[in-house]
Amino acid sequence: MKPFPTHPDAIPAELQDVMDRLGSVAIEVANRIARGGIDEDLAGLCGTNTDGDGQKALDVIADDAFRVALEGSAVRFYASEEQDTAVTLNEAGTLALAIDPLDGSSNIDTNLSVGTIFAIWPAAATAEASFLRLGSELIAAGYVIYGPQVCMMVSFGKGTQKYVLDPGSRSFVLVDRAVKVPPSSTEFAINASNYRHWPKPIRAYIDDCVAGTEGPRGRNFNMRWLASLVAETHRILARGGVFLYPRDSRKGYEQGRLRYLYECAPIAFVITQAGGGATDGENPILGQTPSRLHARTPFVFGSAEKVARITAYHDLPEQETSALFGNRGLFRS
């Protein structure tokens, strides 16, 4: 059975074959994760990628599976977090696909949610021209989350769709054609252990949230942090709120830590198509062009009002971001 047997009108005809291939591999990856530890150790380190990050066995397995499945498809160029350079799959192909085959792999041994993130552009004459371009030129993007449910969230530029894997039929079932980010929430996601390294506007925003009912926001907030971009995104699509991974003062974090091409751009596309916002803290993510294949960027996304508020903190005069939160009454509520 094909992975998307229902609602054939939901996927553009020119992308149907590629989506079928992505969906088929995602189903196999989900099954492999479910059997992890029985047949093989999926969490064991087996190398490093181009940026020196440790590669788990499942990182490499997933990358190989997606790359092989896309050979002979309309994908001309394939760029992966696990590959130093882009790979040519089909000289006659019309598409360029960037992928994080297994996001959140540090969670494998703790049985927390991991996922796959993908982004599709029209192919240009070269891999560089195909990928080093505006995020707004995406024609499709999405992610698969391997959790208690296996879900795919995907956008083809006309809203965001939600599919759930039916384990009985081993196929993805469309359950929502128009996912929307809830406009309001009292949740924020950030790794608070790095507070001392953040820029002042980010510290000011978090200070005001943590101050709760006694601060300028006048309400209590809850912090979340899952160390899995797909899991954070899935929660925000369900409950609203905001995710922050800012640049900071540590070596190697000056431009943030998340990669633009196959993490931030596709997630921003999915979120904005669902009515949310996505920036680098100040400017829209989809209005940017990466300088190299594995370029990093700060990333803020979630409910549109929350994202806009964080941008406004960057516009405050220096004396206000350094002031006690009681003097930032402009940001009440």
Swiss-Prot record:
CDD domains: FBPase. This is Fructose-1,6-bisphosphatase class 1 1. It comes from Cereibacter sphaeroides (strain ATCC 17023 / DSM 158 / JCM 6121 / CCUG 31486 / LMG 2827 / NBRC 12203 / NCIMB 8253 / ATH 2.4.1.). Pathway: Carbohydrate biosynthesis; Calvin cycle. Keywords: Calvin cycle, Carbohydrate metabolism, Cytoplasm, Hydrolase, Magnesium, Metal-binding. It is found in: Cytoplasm. Its cofactor is Mg(2+). It is an enzyme of class 3 (hydrolase). Homotetramer. One of its GO terms (molecular function) is magnesium ion binding. The keyword Chloroplast does not apply. InterPro entries: FBPase_C_dom, FBPase_class-1, FBPase_N, FBPtase, Fructose_bisphosphatase_AS. Belongs to the FBPase class 1 family. Mg(2+) 1 binds at residues 81, 100, 102. Mg(2+) 2 binds at residues 100, 103, 263. GO terms for cellular component: cytosol. Substrate binds at residues 103-106, 191.
